[in-house]
Amino acid sequence: MAISSSSCLGLICSLLCHWVGTASSLNLEDPNVCSHWESYSVTVQESYPHPFDQIYYTSCTDILNWFKCTRHRISYRTAYRHGEKTMYRRKSQCCPGFYESRDMCVPHCADKCVHGRCIAPNTCQCEPGWGGTNCSSACDGDHWGPHCSSRCQCKNRALCNPITGACHCAAGYRGWRCEDRCEQGTYGNDCHQRCQCQNGATCDHITGECRCSPGYTGAFCEDLCPPGKHGPHCEQRCPCQNGGVCHHVTGECSCPSGWMGTVCGQPCPEGRFGKNCSQECQCHNGGTCDAATGQCHCSPGYTGERCQDECPVGSYGVRCAEACRCVNGGKCYHVSGTCLCEAGFSGELCEARLCPEGLYGIKCDKRCPCHLDNTHSCHPMSGECGCKPGWSGLYCNETCSPGFYGEACQQICSCQNGADCDSVTGRCACAPGFKGTDCSTPCPLGRYGINCSSRCGCKNDAVCSPVDGSCICKAGWHGVDCSIRCPSGTWGFGCNLTCQCLNGGACNTLDGTCTCAPGWRGAKCEFPCQDGTYGLNCAERCDCSHADGCHPTTGHCRCLPGWSGVHCDSVCAEGRWGPNCSLPCYCKNGASCSPDDGICECAPGFRGTTCQRICSPGFYGHRCSQTCPQCVHSSGPCHHITGLCDCLPGFTGALCNEVCPSGRFGKNCAGVCTCTNNGTCNPIDRSCQCYPGWIGSDCSQPCPPAHWGPNCIHTCNCHNGAFCSAYDGECKCTPGWTGLYCTQRCPLGFYGKDCALICQCQNGADCDHISGQCTCRTGFMGRHCEQKCPAGTYGYGCRQICDCLNNSTCDHITGTCYCSPGWKGARCDQAGVIIVGNLNSLSRTSTALPADSYQIGAIAGIVVLVLVVLFLLALFIIYRHKQKRKESSMPAVTYTPAMRVINADYTIAETLPHSNGGNANSHYFTNPSYHTLSQCATSPHVNNRDRMTIAKSKNNQLFVNLKNVNPGKRGTLVDCTGTLPADWKQGGYLNELGAFGLDRSYMGKSLKDLGKNSEYNSSTCSLSSSENPYATIKDPPALLPKSSECGYVEMKSPARRDSPYAEINNSTPANRNVYEVEPTVSVVQGVFSNSGHVTQDPYDLPKNSHIPCHYDLLPVRDSSSSPKREDGGGSNSTSSNSTSSSSSSSE
């Protein structure tokens, strides 16, 4: 039983908590901690196998239930239940005589140790110079140490400490009693000084003088003997050769790598290397070893540190430096580079295709179904399409799915940011705004468009879109390139906000603040200047004497009745002065005379004696004392009277700091713009800045076809009829296409506009990516290819007429005839008793099973009964006698339908002629447990009513016994045993043979050719790589049909592996896929007469297989209800039937 993960987690948590709790109280590593174990219970969840009744179906002879029988078996599923588990935990406490102090257990003394410490229960350890049970008594002068129990015993003139008992030794001595010399390496008083002698030299224990070991010299023996010298005092000469180094002490030679001997005079023998040749070379496969380094120099075809590896695929020769040149799937021999071609190819480099271009098959009579423009090869045997890079599908008619490219669309695109990936090269076509090999780098500032090739034209610090170059203007600017200020009355981002300024106030295009015209004030310029003030910002004060204030803009005094003059200070009429206002004034430009002296008082904007001159440039107003404001876009200084600015064309406002309102242009904004289609009008010269996608003086003309963007300067990159947006160049794909530039077909299973429609095609049909129209596979028809060919037709488009006779059925794909009971042959036109399956004597051979004839013995009834009975009785006695001596047996085999095949190859079957005119039988079996191939022994007395009994054992293996073989029917049988080559698996045969276990170097050879090879003489070996539990049985050649024509079709979809019937054990369901189980072509008579024909759906899910030929059939299991033999072989028949019955019951 298993404990669930949640229970385990709870158990671990409880143990952890207990450990933490214990650890927090006592240190378990304390030697004074004692512990004991206590038990406790926890609830856990545990799993157990729960039995249940499982129903399944097997093939049987029950014709009423269509040959299906229900079976029951007991199976188990995992269930869970709660249970209690006893756990143990350790509990810790202080040992007796100890008590707990913090996390330690300390000893307890009843009497406190005064000058000592408690080291054990009721035991004190006194400090030196003290004694007594509680260390409270001091030692007398004759004793020392703990408890005053020791006497001084110092030697070598050492002094004894009466309290500590320590001896103060003389220089060069040590020890408790100073009886020992200083340890090696120390000397002097208390041996505290360390000797400085090196390299094993000895030191005088009193003075520290060094006495050097052999091989060293110097005051501290720190130097080795000079090169070429060794021994005591470095007086001896070294004899080493070949760069050998002499040991400075012994003079022994240390040889360099590759040399050996007393004086390093001998090179390493072969197979050895390294220092003193002590290491053994580890080079394999004929590699040689460098005597110095041990590095392997590999023989041609091998590599690796020890030459243990063959050259990687695609290389050969010395150091694997040569590149293989084999084409068309040919395998390159790693030593010489010789090409081992796949079936269907030949030539030194496998460059020659056996079939003409466009054809394939055994007879090169089938036309390749590949789309030629997208295909680089059509396999000459299987017809499999080898797609060019960028294409996939059965017929190379599908582009790579988005995100994949290259050979077989197996490589993953690295493109980022919505880039298109070239399905052939994988090169990235970046979306506008990105660049780089993988389109991961955004455009730098100032660049935009495809590959960032265009330069931004935005002005006034506007942000340029890296995609289409459109400008995102800062506040206060607008236009295609952000070169135009916001029109009068607008401000902010996009000039979308309306100014709130009144009375001619100018609006700041950035923040909307108002700059008031002269004479006005307030946040919105809604208030006139206060009484007594006038001018810009109401900063000037009125200079009037008898007036009702002054004009808020000009400061002109509004005189009270009876008063006149510039300052309203004269009682004379306008133009008079002096006594009784009798003198005329000569002042000009509205000036007044002083009533006293006639001096001219000039009106605002004028100056001079008679006020005939205007203010100097830059000044205006009363007495020309006011300074002109900063006119932004003006043709000159301000007006000498009002102070207003004279604006340039396109500008307006008191300070000429406002652009003409939208739709107006020119001097005083008097002109009307004519721009259309959202074009921006230049307020100065009326020119139009067109919106992307439009051109012309008034932006009324759209971009020409295949152009887009501002002024239509960019060229569209859309393909396959896609519509290109004139604004941003975006491609609007036509139905059936997708991708950034509409270069990719709809993914598999989709079609139509935006690839949004789901294909409805069935049975592996191709779906047109534009219209969704289905192109049916061979054997199907209908709008969605949902219908099989009508009865009597088959093939592509169901245009071919079946040629099957005698009520036989026709395969709707291949036209293969499925014969009615009692018939055989390619067209079911032969009355048959023997059914043979043969596809290829070398590639794949199906089992041929004998059957009883309904008519044998009919002619014998005409003969005189007495003579016939006597004759048959004699034959029967002879047969029984021979049969007892024969006792031939066959090894156990496991059948597979040999249909789960990839790239299977065909070779025309041949037979070996025998000396007596018969055919030599190459009868063989394949079995995972048997690698020995057995052939049947010759039997001179064989009844032509031969039978093959098939019984199923308890371990589900099939055992086959060939009995009563007729020499005339089956040819002379040779008793021999062939064994597989020793390197069958190790030499790579398993990978080279293909799905049928055939070395392709033997493809196309006859059995006669193979028979000449001594290694394979008298044996035919088969090694199946199929995953099915049935292997192939090759029957005697006499059972082969005269014609070897076989139905053949290429199906490449993968086989289903998840079906509960993917492997055959005890039954063959009615819906068995014909590509997983070979169809029963004809009903076997005699012992198999109740088997019947099983209706199957052979095209449930096709895969890359070869359709069986007309004579392929399943191994049929014997039934307990079958009739007994007609030849009187009762014992054999009974034995066979009983064996079959036991097999059935075992299920």
UniProtKB/Swiss-Prot annotation:
Keywords: Cell adhesion, Cell membrane, Cell projection, Disulfide bond, EGF-like domain, Glycoprotein, Membrane, Myogenesis, Phagocytosis, Phosphoprotein, Repeat, Signal, Transmembrane, Transmembrane helix, Ubl conjugation. Residues 1093-1147 are annotated as: Disordered. Residues 30-107 form the EMI domain. GO terms for biological process: apoptotic process involved in development; engulfment of apoptotic cell; homotypic cell-cell adhesion; muscle cell development; myoblast development; myoblast migration; positive regulation of cell-cell adhesion; positive regulation of myoblast proliferation. Residues 945-1147 are annotated as: Necessary for formation of large intracellular vacuoles. Expressed in cerebellum (at protein level). Expressed in kidney, stellate cells of the cerebellum and macrophage cell lines. Residues 101-136, 144-179, 187-222, 230-265, 278-308, 316-351, 405-440, 453-483, 491-526, 539-569, 577-612, 665-700, 713-743, 751-786, 799-829 form the EGF-like domain. The keyword ATP-binding does not apply. Residues 26-857 are extracellular. The chain crosses the membrane at residues 858-878. Belongs to the MEGF family. This is Multiple epidermal growth factor-like domains protein 10. It comes from Mus musculus. The gene is Megf10.
